[in-house]
């Protein structure tokens, strides 16, 4: 892997979906960190997150959508009003989020947590 910033940016821009998923990780809360023995996890629809930066700082809500193409996450309650009056989710970068509660509906995800613990 290159050290050159331009090549780093190029990799992020052209990354395949399986690599983008890993890049869409957020830190775990202290309690979850102690429970699972790891620092971060890729975000998933249904996870409860806390917003750490920006206009919605301090807000907690469920992840409604993870957009791998744009590297953005949409959180329930973090919405803005468009000029025409419609309400849309505000796109948030995963680095500005902290996972407070995990969505453990998926068996594979549970196995991942057990494996790393």
Swiss-Prot record:
According to its UniProt entry, one GO biological process term is: translation
UniProt KW Ribonucleoprotein keyword: yes
The entry's cellular-component GO terms read: large ribosomal subunit
Q: Name one GO molecular function term.
A: rRNA binding
Claim: rRNA-binding is one of the keywords in the record:
yes
Enumerate the UniProt keywords alphabetically.
Ribonucleoprotein, Ribosomal protein, RNA-binding, rRNA-binding
Query: What InterPro entries does its record include?
Result: KOW (IPR005824), Rib_uL2_dom2 (IPR014722), Ribosomal_uL24_CS (IPR005825), Ribosomal_uL24_euk/arc (IPR005756), Ribosomal_uL24_KOW (IPR041988), Translation_prot_SH3-like_sf (IPR008991)
Task performed by this protein:
One of two assembly initiator proteins, it binds directly to the 5'-end of the 23S rRNA, where it nucleates assembly of the 50S subunit. Located at the polypeptide exit tunnel on the outside of the subunit.
Q: Which family does it belong to?
A: Belongs to the universal ribosomal protein uL24 family.
Q: How does it assemble?
A: Part of the 50S ribosomal subunit.
Identification of the protein by name: Large ribosomal subunit protein uL24
The organism is: Methanothermobacter thermautotrophicus (strain ATCC 29096 / DSM 1053 / JCM 10044 / NBRC 100330 / Delta H)
Its lineage reads: Archaea, Methanobacteriati, Methanobacteriota, Methanomada group, Methanobacteria
């Amino acid at each position: 892997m290159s050290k050159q910033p331009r090549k780093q940016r190029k990799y992020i821009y052209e990354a395949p979906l399986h690599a983008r998923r890993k890049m869409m990780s957020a830190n775990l809360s202290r309690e979850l960190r102690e429970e699972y023995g790891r620092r971060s996890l890729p975000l998933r629809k249904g996870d409860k997150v806390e917003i750490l930066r920006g206009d919605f700082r301090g807000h907690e809500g469920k992840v409604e959508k993870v957009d791998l193409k744009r590297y953005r996450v949409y959180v329930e309650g973090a919405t803005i009003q468009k000029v025409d009056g419609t309400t849309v989710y505000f796109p948030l970068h995963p680095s500005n989020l902290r996972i407070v509660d995990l969505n453990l509906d998926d068996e594979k995800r549970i196995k991942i947590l057990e494996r790393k613990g």
